[in-house]
């Protein structure tokens, strides 16, 4: 079931306005800033930092308009009643499936994003490509720039603050705090129209978007891709463990 279908929209509305949204609002009392920067109609790309799996719960609550994200196709293809319910839940919360294996991941997200934007809707994307493992902001993938140039849609930089306290990496829920969702002024890249294959332009646009996100979030920026940084941290931690158990000379 595509998120753009009538059934998907109905589930999205019910989850946001009746079942899940009111609970999130009452329990966590999220704070929204800059929502006036998100257009009332027409396509736009919401580019955000990514601290926790809980991010996708608070972003839709912050906006009156429906917002669509991409999710692993595994969530939509599992068998049985549980798989059926999971598929309906993820589709109903405004997510569309993509195959994230190999080199097809970025193209799948790009195609999904273009379809959403062509319908005149909001498409959410995390340029870092994965959650930050340490709360810092990492180098953005250039897919967000390609999407902006191919669609002609404005990019709304966004920052989510506090969700890593609510649900740190590897944990579901540890603490109830009020997260903040911020939206910055729209970024227009129409001056680069027709240059979606120029890697230098794509890098420049992506860096501009990441700088805007950093300004909103107040995070420390690291000029390294998040997966590489996470792997480096894991290697360092493992080396430290070995040093601790090694016999002293």
Which residues does each predicted region cover?
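Catalytic core of membrane glycerolipid acyltransferases/transacylases, capturing the structured
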Residues: 25, 38-103
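Non-catalytic C-terminal accessory region of glycerolipid acyltransferases
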Residues: 2-7, 11, 107-249
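Short secondary-structure junction/hinge motifs that connect adjacent elements
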Residues: 33-41, 227-229
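A generic local structural motif
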Residues: 18, 30-35, 54-56, 83, ...
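Alpha-helical membrane-targeting segments
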Residues: 3-27, 78-94, 172-178
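Short gly/ser/thr-rich secondary-structure transition/capping motifs
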Residues: 25-32, 105-107, 163-165
